[in-house]
Structures are given as C-alpha cells and as structure tokens.
A protein has these predicted regions:
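Outer-membrane beta-barrel "beta-signal"
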Residues: 11-16, 177-179, 187, 212-226
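Transmembrane beta-barrel domains of outer membrane proteins
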Residues: 19-23, 70-74, 113-119, 144-148, ...
C-alpha cells in the first residue's frame, strides 16, 4: 500500500510512505511501514535574535524532516484491523535564525506506533492512531468516529480530535470533522483507472499553545492498495 498526507494550517506537515504485509493487508501477520515527512511551523526566536533581549522576539520558522521504518504485527477481524509497530526513526530540524551558525546533526531514535481501524456496525467507523518517538521526543495521536449515510456519500462522516506535543514545549490541539474512505468519481479523472485509490479529508479548529491563538486546519490523505 502506498499513501501520502498533507496537514495544512498555521503549521504544516506533508508525508509519504508505504506499508507492506506479506500475507495481505486484510489478514493476520507481520507488517512493515516506512515513512518520510517534512514539517514547517512558525515560532518566536527567543535565542538567536538580539531583539529577544528587549522582549520582542521576531517570528522564525522551524523546519523538520522525519523518517521512520517500523515493523510489527496486525490482527484482522470481522470488525476491522489493529496493529502495533516498533523501529528506528531519524529526525533533523533547524531554525531560520541568525543564531543558527551551522546545520545540526540528525538525531536517531526509536518509534512506537499503534493503529486501529474498526467498524462496530456496517454503517460506522472508529479509527485511532498513536505515534511516539525519541528522536525529537514527540507524540501524536488522533481518534475519529464516523457514520456512512449512503443517500449522502460513500464516505464515513463524523468528528475527529488530535493532539501533537514535542520536547520544545510545543502543543497543538485540533477538533474537526472528517470524511473518510471515498474515491474520486470518474467524471473528475476519466482517463485514470485507479478504482482502489481512496481518500480522507478533514477540517476544523486548531489551537497551538505557543502561539495562543486559535486557527483553522485542513488535511488530505490518499492511499492506494497494491
């Protein structure tokens, strides 16, 4: 399975990756997951700019690159799939600041990941994802619930909530609505034969503790079983 995602807002993150299950994504068995992502977020430069000494730190940008390769086991049941992963991760981050005299070295760490994709009934979907890593001492989690209304859409529609935190003290909370597991109509891509290409979109309210102002966010995820 190939996948990619974009999380856009005041801070943004884009990633892509692949999942491989030798016995099939719908069966019990081993599974591996590899990802590569890039993030960009604004923050105050309290350390590298002289204006910070006067209490007026300018805004700067933090660039982050993360990569991970984890392996684990998935359990497939009639109600859905659950999986646990562990493996190494690599992180590199740098500030657009006068105090950045040279690029820092990448940091190596360990990553743990848990996923749940469950259908309690034929018309409902519950998802949960939790990722924790030591390269940046970061954690990200998201839960969602959705209901499928065939008269309106093939997607599951419902609420979602997410939280991200890392060692810098940065915290980002979000609450919104999502549409999960739908394809593009042929009228949009009439020349492409990708009936298995699926999508997830969401949008809502986000609050970043360091900025202390609410904002809005939007996400787009696509996956293609192979």
């Amino acid at each position: 399975m190939l996948f990619g995602s974009l999380d856009a807002g005041r801070s943004s993150f884009v990633s892509a990756g692949a999942k491989f299950a030798p016995d099939g994504v719908g069966r019990d068995g081993p599974v591996t997951l590899a990802t590569l992502g890039y993030g960009l977020r604004p923050e105050r430069d309290w350390w590298g700019d002289p204006r910070a000494q006067a209490g007026r730190p300018p805004r700067t940008l933090r660039h982050t690159v993360q990569a991970g390769a984890v392996a684990g086991w998935q359990w497939a049941r009639d109600w859905g799939v659950a999986a646990l992963f562990a493996g190494p991760e690599l992180a590199f981050e740098v500030l657009d600041s006068p105090g950045t005299e040279r690029l820092p070295a990448p940091r190596l760490g360990a990553r743990m990941q848990a996923e749940l994709w469950a259908r309690p009934t034929d018309a409902t979907l519950v998802t949960a994802t939790l990722i924790g890593g030591t390269a940046r001492w970061s954690a990200w989690g998201r839960v969602s619930w959705g209901v499928r209304l065939p008269a309106l859409s093939e997607a599951y529609l419902g609420p979602e909530a997410a939280l991200y935190a890392d060692r810098t003290g940065y915290r980002k909370w979000s609450l919104g609505l999502h549409a999960t597991d739908f394809g593009l109509p042929q009228i949009i891509l009439p020349q492409m034969s990708l009936p298995q290409l699926r999508f997830r979109v969401s949008a809502g309210w986000v609050y970043e503790e360091q900025i202390r102002r609410p904002g809005i966010y939007g996400t787009l995820t696509a996956w293609l079983p192979l």
